[in-house]
Curated annotation (Swiss-Prot):
InterPro entries: Irc6. Gene3D superfamilies: 3.40.50.11960. GO terms for biological process: vesicle-mediated transport. Belongs to the IRC6 family. Involved in gross chromosomal rearrangements (GCRs) and telomere healing. One of its GO terms (molecular function) is protein-macromolecule adaptor activity. Transmembrane segments: none annotated. The keyword S-adenosyl-L-methionine does not apply. The keyword Phosphoprotein does not apply. It comes from the Eukaryota. It comes from Lachancea thermotolerans (strain ATCC 56472 / CBS 6340 / NRRL Y-8284) (Yeast). This is Increased recombination centers protein 6. The gene is IRC6. Keywords: Chromosomal rearrangement. PANTHER family: INCREASED RECOMBINATION CENTERS PROTEIN 6.
Length: 251
């Protein structure tokens, strides 16, 4: 996989192959206190010491297996996190993400959260991109809930609620189960898929398994800043290609 370094107007270097989308980003509100449980139930990975990148996670259905990287992040304020993540410096990061899952409680005035989520959807870089919102709490009135669902549907976002049935169990199509269904139906690139009829080879382990999401985002910002400060010319393009190769090892 090779990722192009973003240029002045966010364009990928001409002629560079398009990156495959083999990452899933899950982002937790700091108000979610069972993130370890959710992370394990969805992806089967441990939330060890706040680890932000889990590489080589096999996602298996009845029909296929795909190996993905799971990126984990958190926020105290969704609007602030959205403003940073939608920054042009992180075009390359968004270009390799197949979808994201936002986990947060909804309570009281939800207009701010809805606006931030709408901006995230607008920055989705592919029609095949999925967005799921796992609402750990939906403590809002009927009007607020209708407002949320209207805006969610308008933005092609799927709202999932951890709602309990009369026996205290999660309903089959709600909560974590529904999030997993959404990932199951993701339109993965054929090159990423391994089916029951094909022998799969284990993918190469990344040399950057210890790299955090914060370090990746920092490297993207640093590379873009240096690129923009250089004079146009051959040296600038050579730097762009070198950085693209280096950054592709991180993503």
């Amino acid at each position: 996989m090779t990722t192009g370094l973003s240029l002045d107007e966010g364009k990928v270097i001409e002629g560079r192959p398009k990156a495959l989308r083999d990452k899933v980003l899950i982002v937790f509100s700091n108000k979610v206190f069972n993130r370890e449980e959710i992370l394990f139930e969805v992806f089967g990975v441990e939330d060890n010491a706040g680890k932000q990148v889990h590489r080589g996670v096999d996602w298996t259905t009845k029909y296929y297996t795909v190996t993905i990287d799971v990126y984990v992040d958190s926020f105290s304020n969704l609007e602030d996190w959205t403003n940073e993540f939608c920054d042009p410096d992180f075009d390359e990061l968004r270009d390799v993400i197949a979808g994201w899952i936002i986990v947060l409680p909804f309570s009281g005035n939800i207009e701010e959260e809805t606006k931030a989520l709408s901006r995230l959807v607008n920055n989705a870089t592919s029609e095949d991109f999925f967005t799921a919102i796992l609402a750990t709490e939906l403590n809002v009135g009927k009007n607020e809930r209708a407002f949320l669902e209207y805006n969610v549907l308008a933005g092609a976002v799927e709202l999932v609620h951890n709602e309990l049935d009369s026996d205290g169990e999660l309903k089959e199509v709600n909560g974590v189960d529904r999030v997993k269904e959404i990932i199951d139906t993701c339109d993965w690139h054929p090159r990423l898929l391994r089916t029951a009829h094909l022998e799969s080879e284990t993918g190469m382990e990344s040399a950057c398994t210890g790299i955090s999401l914060a370090q990746i985002m920092g490297s993207l910002r640093e590379a873009r800043t240096k690129y923009m400060a250089m004079d146009p010319g051959l040296d600038r393009e050579e730097f762009a290609n070198e950085m693209a190769n280096e950054l592709s090892k991180l993503l």
